[in-house]
């Protein structure tokens, strides 16, 4: 046998690693980089949640992969209390945050049905939907989105639908904040026998509505809602989420995941129970994000970028005046010391935009405003 390198899957550069050059530019500013590129919360979780991590007395035993009864009860109670969802015959199981679930679900689904080899996902979306397909050896097929950043179901090729393991939808959407018609999407999937996986991690941050929408409002058959505490409760470091919906799908995936050892640590489950049972901290966080989105919109509008407030989510999706997202990202790095994500990270059709995450502490946004005020003063003096 030869000693050559065997050709195979080579992971692409991680999107945010490609920002190192721009980060170096922002680091030169007094006060350093103001990072608006990643949606990692900066505000603290409720103190009761943090306390539960150290008082659960649950460190020694192996936790249930599906989640403890208290964990699942708290998650179901949150869905009912907060969104009026009658879970009915829906099943529910824990996941270790949602990113690992998004990345691994296609692999597990294909093991069950090797005749299907396609994952459908929004053309502008979280990169892990496509990566999950690639890691499973599947075709990653983007679905066109309309001017409101919502899926154009009529654009899906019938041959792709016939080969689809699943259709991913994300509402409120990342990066553009679109709000999907989940009733139509659920029906599309049922009519074609395609499971619909709805990533709803921003559901609490639906703007202009009393409550967010879940695909579970339209029944559990053939659908799955995926949720996380990362954004809702500022618990991205805890890695706690759940998937709920079609009992057959939940049963299959939870059994496979149990064999794979996918478990939310028991102390994290205890903390999650506390978080799911409290809504006051979420209401306070909603007010914080609303203010930040408006402040950042005003800042980025000075670049002649088209910046609308999102229907939901934590991001501004700003259109570059010259159609070059990288150029706009470089400009804000050089002039404001801020790091934003070029839109191409979320699909080729996003290349004319940047994504701005409203998660930086208020003091860092103060700093951006001070820098821009100083820059305007310099411009006037010149």
Annotated model-derived regions:
Residues 2-100, 275-276, 378-382:
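N-terminal small-domain helix-loop-helix segment of the aminotransferase-like
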Residues 117, 191-195, 221:
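A short helix->loop->beta-strand "cap" motif at the edges of active sites that frequently abuts
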Residues 331-340, 346-382:
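PLP-dependent enzyme catalytic core of the Aspartate aminotransferase-like
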Residues 107-169:
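PLP-dependent aminotransferase-like
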Residues 221-290, 375-377:
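Conserved core segment of the aminotransferase class I/II
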Residues 269, 273, 289-297, 307-319, ...:
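Conserved glycine-rich beta-strand-loop-beta hairpin in the small C-terminal domain of fold type I
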């Amino acid at each position: 046998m030869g000693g050559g390198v065997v050709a195979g899957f080579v992971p692409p550069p991680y999107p945010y690693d490609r920002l190192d050059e721009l980060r170096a530019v922002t680091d030169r500013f007094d006060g350093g980089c103001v990072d608006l590129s990643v949606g990692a919360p900066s505000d603290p979780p409720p103190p009761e949640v943090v306390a539960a991590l150290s008082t659960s007395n649950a460190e020694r035993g192996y936790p249930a992969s599906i989640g403890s009864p208290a964990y699942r009860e708290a998650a179901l109670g949150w869905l009912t209390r907060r969104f009026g969802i009658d879970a009915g015959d829906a099943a529910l199981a824990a996941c270790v945050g949602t990113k690992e679930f998004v990345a691994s679900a296609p692999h597990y689904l294909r093991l069950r049905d090797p005749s299907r080899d396609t994952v459908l996902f929004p053309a502008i979306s979280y990169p892990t939907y496509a990566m999950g397909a690639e890691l499973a050896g599947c075709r990653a097929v983007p679905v066109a989105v309309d001017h409101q950043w919502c899926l154009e179901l009529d654009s899906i090729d019938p041959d792709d639908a016939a080969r689809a393991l699943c259709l991913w939808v994300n509402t409120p959407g990342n990066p553009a904040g679109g709000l999907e018609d989940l009733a139509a999407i659920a029906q599309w999937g049922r009519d074609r026998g395609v499971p619909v996986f709805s990533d709803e991690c921003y559901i609490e941050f639906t703007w202009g509505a009393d409550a967010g929408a879940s695909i579970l409002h339209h029944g559990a058959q053939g659908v799955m809602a995926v949720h996380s505490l990362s954004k809702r409760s500022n618990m991205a470091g805890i890695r706690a989420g759940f998937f709920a919906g079609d009992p057959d799908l939940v049963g299959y995936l939870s059994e496979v995941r149990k064999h794979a050892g996918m478990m939310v640590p028991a102390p994290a489950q205890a903390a999650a129970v506390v978080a799911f049972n409290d809504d006051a901290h979420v209401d306070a966080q909603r007010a914080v994000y609303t203010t930040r989105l408006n402040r950042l919109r005003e800042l980025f509008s000075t670049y002649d970028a088209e910046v609308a407030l999102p229907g939901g989510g934590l991001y501004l999706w700003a259109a570059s005046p010259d159609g070059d997202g990288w150029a706009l990202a470089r400009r804000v790095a050089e002039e404001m010391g801020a790091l934003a994500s070029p839109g191409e990270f979320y699909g080729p059709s996003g290349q004319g935009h940047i994504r701005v995450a409203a998660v930086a502490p208020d003091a860092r946004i103060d700093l951006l405003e001070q820098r821009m005020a100083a820059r305007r003063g310099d411009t006037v003096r010149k």
